[in-house]
Design a protein with these regions (language model features):
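Type III/flagellar secretion export determinants
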Residues: 1-194
Length: 194
């Protein structure tokens, strides 16, 4: 009789608890918690959206959101690859827009702000010159500020991005993450050879 009770709980041949049951249960609970957090986050910090390609601004080649901002790099309709100038728009939590034209051939990787470097790394990825540049740049910035601790004001501060990349590489090396280390190294090597 006792064996029949076990079979009724989980099916024929399964013991209790079923393999993986706790993991599936934990995932559902985590997903429920995340869904419940979204309205609170939007209500307290404002709603941010990724801005995409449009007729007025052009093709979006890079777009991201942070704690209190949204940032998009547009390739204008009159874009000339020989003179790569991009339109960058930054939205703050109040919906105010800052617009800037960035000539990526003039970006100083050892002394520029996040906006110019994001435009430059987006250009390198979109053009195929360094396909992993944008991803490596975003992750290096997250390594410095945390996943979502960068603020609108942080976008305008001047940084030595070569040092930021080297710090991110060292973090990956110390953690034993060879792939992460090599992803940063590819971008850093490209910048060193330009």
């Amino acid at each position: 009789m006792e064996e029949i009770k076990k079979m009724n709980v989980n099916g024929i041949g399964a013991g209790y608890p079923a393999a993986g049951y706790e993991t599936r249960r934990a995932r559902r609970n985590y997903a429920d918690q995340m869904c419940n957090m979204v309205p609170t986050t939007q209500a307290s910090g404002g709603t941010f959206e990724l801005h995409i390609s449009n007729d007025k601004d052009g093709k979006a080649i890079g777009s991201m959101c942070g704690a209190d901002y949204s940032l998009t790099v547009y390739q204008p309709k009159d874009f000339d690859p020989a003179n790569p100038v991009y339109k960058v728009k930054v939205w703050d939590k109040g919906g105010n827009v800052t617009e800037r034209m960035v000539d990526v051939s003039k970006v100083d990787t050892a002394g520029s702000d996040y906006i110019d470097m994001f435009a430059y790394s987006s250009h390198l990825s979109a053009s195929g010159k360094c396909p992993g540049a944008q991803s490596a740049f975003i992750r290096a910035g997250a390594n410095q500020h945390g996943a979502d601790n960068r603020t609108h004001d942080d976008l305008f501060g001047m940084k030595d991005w070569i040092s930021v990349l080297k710090d991110a590489m060292q973090t990956q090396y110390d953690a034993g993450n060879l792939k992460g280390y090599l992803d940063y190294k590819q971008f850093l090597d490209f910048l060193d050879n330009k």
